[in-house]
Curated annotation (Swiss-Prot):
InterPro entries: RGI1, RGI1_sf. Keywords: Cell membrane, Membrane. It comes from Candida glabrata (strain ATCC 2001 / BCRC 20586 / JCM 3761 / NBRC 0622 / NRRL Y-65 / CBS 138). It is a peripheral membrane protein. It is found in: Cell membrane. Belongs to the RGI1 family. GO terms for cellular component: plasma membrane. The lineage of its organism: Eukaryota, Fungi, Dikarya, Ascomycota, Saccharomycotina. Signal peptide: none annotated. Involved in the control of energetic metabolism and significantly contribute to cell fitness, especially under respiratory growth conditions. Pfam families: RGI1 (PF10843). This is Respiratory growth induced protein 1. It comes from the Eukaryota. GO terms for biological process: energy reserve metabolic process. The keyword Repeat does not apply.
Length: 157
């Protein structure tokens, strides 16, 4: 019996600007990448994306993406409320822990809402190992499915 390959599901894309962008499909792989980059002293210049089904959606569908209800999208108030709670209580908390910055507050918060999607923006300036940088996290949910996009970027100051 062969062992299942547990390598992270990640693709590296080069943008039009020549920037290298890592795209993840798994929340745990995304968080592990941020943690590893922090430990490797590469924490202040990262850009990566995560596209995933939130854990509460998968739990509701018994971990079967085929059984996810079509109504789980940005037009569903319950879905939006649960997604916002997931982002605030789990995703951002896990990012803080990966950065070894549990006191991080993400003071720069905003929300953009259109018919097509809802976007939450989180930003904060911080310092780690005497290096100042800005963290930007953008979370987007769309009107047509339960898939969520997270854009994580750190910029040296």
């Amino acid at each position: 019996m062969a062992k299942k390959d547990k390598k992270p599901k990640v693709n590296t894309i080069v943008t039009k600007d020549g920037e290298s962008l890592k795209v993840f499909e798994d929340l745990n792989d995304f968080e592990m990448f941020i943690k590893n980059e922090t430990e490797d002293e590469e924490f202040d210049h990262i850009h990566c994306k995560l596209t995933y089904y939130p854990p509460f959606v998968l739990h509701e569908s018994h971990d079967d993406p085929e059984k996810i209800k079509d109504t789980n999208n940005s037009h569903n108030k319950k879905f939006v409320r649960h997604l916002h709670q997931h982002v605030e209580k789990h995703l951002l908390k896990d990012i803080k822990e990966a950065l070894h910055k549990p006191e991080l507050k993400f003071h720069d918060k905003s929300k953009d809402e259109t018919f097509e999607h809802i976007v939450w923006h989180y930003g904060e300036e911080t310092e780690y190992h005497d290096r100042k940088f800005r963290i930007q996290v953008t979370v987007t949910c769309n009107h047509d499915d339960a898939m969520v996009d997270v854009d994580y970027k750190t910029i040296p100051l």
